[in-house]
């Protein structure tokens, strides 16, 4: 379960199934991977039962993703403004002028100065931390109800990591959204998450609020 306004941390070693599980929420699993059974309930609807068009209305709109490596996630030959505005034009049905204004506001909201000038820059003109801020602005472009952050600070140095964590915490309140935060860093989740799920070999080993996980872990793997 994911509750409104909470940050749910999913933690586990590499290969434990963290990313695969959350990619299945919006059916982004690449072949030959596939969902065999089960259900994913969002707003009383099983996402797995939706056709492609209905799923697209949710993906990138009501449920959005921030991926681990912004350099490989951003298109190197497209200006960042065009990459942000794409979802806005598709889901919010704004005209080009208002969509551009919204895009510039998003760039500004994630802490990138001179947003109007940076709108026409390419990904290679940004630092790693700034590229991740661009990814965050893409994730927030349509005011999602749920933001899935898949190890969004892994490729960044410690100082920039802290800035990105603080930024996402602030934006969670501003946009009134829930967050699923995937990481292998238990220390990071200590001051960030409300609840934590511990995974190993594709299975949930333990689930509890953050205080219980740290003060009284039940499963040997968590300990």
Region spans (language model):
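P-loop NTP-binding/switch modules centered on Walker-like glycine-rich loops
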Residues: 13, 27, 148, 152, ...
């Amino acid at each position: 379960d994911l509750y409104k306004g909470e940050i749910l941390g999913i933690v586990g070693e590499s290969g434990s199934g963290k990313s695969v599980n959350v990619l299945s929420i919006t059916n982004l699993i690449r072949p030959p991977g596939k969902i065999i059974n089960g259900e994913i309930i969002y707003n009383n609807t099983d996402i797995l039962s939706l056709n492609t068009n209905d799923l697209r209305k949710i993906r990138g709109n009501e449920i959005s993703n921030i991926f681990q490596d912004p350099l490989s996630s951003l298109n190197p030959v497209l200006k960042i403004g065009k990459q942000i505005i794409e979802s806005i034009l598709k889901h919010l049905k704004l005209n080009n002028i208002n969509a551009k204004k919204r895009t510039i506001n998003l760039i500004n909201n994630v802490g990138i100065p001179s947003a109007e000038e940076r709108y026409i820059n390419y990904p290679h003109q940004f630092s790693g931390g700034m590229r991740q801020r661009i990814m965050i602005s893409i994730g927030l472009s349509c005011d999602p109800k749920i933001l899935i952050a898949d190890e969004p600070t892994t490729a960044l140095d410690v100082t920039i990591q802290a800035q990105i964590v603080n930024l996402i915490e602030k934006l969670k309140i501003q946009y009134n959204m829930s967050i699923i935060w995937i990481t292998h860093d238990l220390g990071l989740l200590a001051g960030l998450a409300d609840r934590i799920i511990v995974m190993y070999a594709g299975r949930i080993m333990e689930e509890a609020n953050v205080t219980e996980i740290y003060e009284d872990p039940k499963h040997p793997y968590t300990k």
